[in-house]
Amino acid sequence: MKNLKTIGWVGSLGTLITILAFSGSGFRNQLPEPVIEKSGLIRNEGNFYYRDLNKNGKLDVYEDPRQPIENRIQDLLKQMNLEEKAGMMFYSPTRVNKDGTIEEEPAKDFLATMSPVGVTEMDKRHISHFNLFSVPEPDTLAIWYNRMQKHAEKGRLGIPITIASDPRNQDAGGFFNMSAKTFSIWPDPLGLAAIGDAKLMEEFANISRQEYLAVGIRQALHPQVDLATEPRWPRIAGTFGEDATLSAKMTTAYIKGYQGEKISEKSVAMMTKHFPGGGPQKEGLDPHFAFQKGQVYPGNNFKYHLIPFEAAFKSQTAAIMPYYGVPMGQKDYEEVGFSYNKSIVTSLLRNKYHYDGVVCTDWGLVSDAKIGNLDFPARAWGVEKLNKEERVQRIIEAGVDQLGGENLPEIIVQLVKDGRLSEHRIDESVVRLLRLKFELGLFENPFIDEKKAGEIVGKAEFMKAGQDAMRRSITLLKNDNHALPLATNKLKIFVKGINPKVAAEYGMVVTDPKQADIAIIRLKTPSYPIPETKGNPIAGFFHFGDLDFKGKELDDILALEKTVPTVVDIYLDRAAVIPEISQNAKALLANYGASDAALLDVVFGKYKPGGHLPIELPSSMEAVRNQKEDVPYDTKDPLYKFGFGLSY
């Protein structure tokens, strides 16, 4: 083969770049520096530089970025064996060693017990999709990521890995958010919806995209576009509220900010969830657990919950994740979990909406899990009697491409060998999965610049943008006699739920409310243990139960309000029921994840509140119990209506 040479990693980086740029007279392409530095497979054919992923000494179609993606997919598909195809169809959790190494070591924490080591999964099961839970600092994560890609490069076909994550830019304590750590911190998605500004939503997504790319996260297990039509549901904070039009608007901007106009090497691919809408949960319980398998539609409002997904389809979301729930009382849909449900995945999603992107299940539909000493049964609702092989077969026959939180490719291999699934059906899913990897540019440049990770993640301008959004999202619900804004450094203030050191920058902090001119307190929407969660510590992480304050907790709040004029701020991760607190407060504000400084900047007039309620606040628990789980803003005589918000 003419002018074929392998370029080893020898000498300085500058020398290597010079070799690549100027060797031969017909230079045509320049490889990105991370590939130059990290890849051991760079070759030159006719002065065209590429990665010889299958190590056969020649330029294959799938290795050639000049070729159409569909041609590259078909070339690679022909070279893959059944085991490699099956491995593509699983999204396995993985853990990151704190020192950035990729070698297997004993699990040391709660989340690590759920997460096998990535290199083991690559070597034994050909898995190339991994999602992260807890992670180390950005620079360490970047080192780990490059080492993982380097290991993937050594595989028979050199197929790069894809790393995914749940949201990492909120830190309000939501169970479904990964800790922001050094990532820029923003209000919950509910707070961004309270602002309602599509340009700001796109800005947030673009900033988060840059941070994700800096550490190698190429797929986001969000946005969550469920409609918050049931006030008691624990997952409201991750939504854009209960209004379908607002949610669709936010969804469009969100996807554009992460993916761009089309998916490219600069994109983070979206996995929009939870199709066909996870909001209408009976009494606000959640189908993560066996005590609540079915979604209910007493208002016959199934189609309303599809509206945000229609916006996601128009925005070309890379992937869709169905929820765990079972559609109850819907004549067109079988009463089995959505990912097991061919009428949902094939008839509705594939055929009606002509969606040809990736469909990935929510996590843990096939295998029972053991988390520490806790048993966590598979969410195989409606098909509990099926064994693992039958569950996997049922999911794939429903039209799903990928199984989240599982690592069972050997089952797919056996199903094909037994004639229960065709390899052609497996190929359909693998084509979609490969297409996304190619579109993301992972076959050309899977590596990142480790030196830039710490510079990009959480940089000052990103942090400032997040703090500004927190301030802007704060929603003023009551301002008796224009009590707000308060005068800075002129008042004695009593605070509760606020760091006194932060408060001291705004006034003289006193410990006795009777000596204060004003009290400022921060509350969180209540939650209570329910009988169904008894003996289930995992369910205890979910905020279930009534939405109103009770007993001594309520008495103490009301007593304070009667002792001193009180400014009340409440964090809304669900729709709080606070009529007595509102009535007695001098001023009332709502937040959706905001720092003490962001709140006090608004209270003391450095910034104006700009939020409007993305969910209504009911006036009583009776009204909550009487509303219909699938219908928006339908509680009787709400205390504060959807869209309400004051300013000054």
Each predicted region: which residue ranges?
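Phosphate/pyrophosphate-binding active-site segments
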Residues: F443-E444, I448-D449
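C-terminal non-catalytic regions of proteins with extracellular/luminal or membrane-system context
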Residues: K2-I7, L16-N47, L53, A112-S115, ...
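Binuclear metal-dependent hydrolase catalytic cores centered on His/Asp/Glu-rich metal-binding motifs
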Residues: F275, K282-F302
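Short beta-alpha connecting loops at secondary-structure transitions
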Residues: R235, A290-Y297, Q330-E335, A369-V400, ...
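Short acidic, glycine/serine/threonine-rich loops at helix termini
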Residues: A172-S179, P231-I236, P280-P287, K331-E334, ...
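Short glycine/threonine-rich loop-to-helix capping motif typified by GTGT followed
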Residues: A237-T239, K331-K342, A460, N499-E505, ...
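N-terminal beta-rich core of secreted/periplasmic extracellular enzymes
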Residues: Q30-P276, L306-M321, E335-L408, L421-L442, ...
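Extended catalytic-interface subdomain
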Residues: Y323-G329
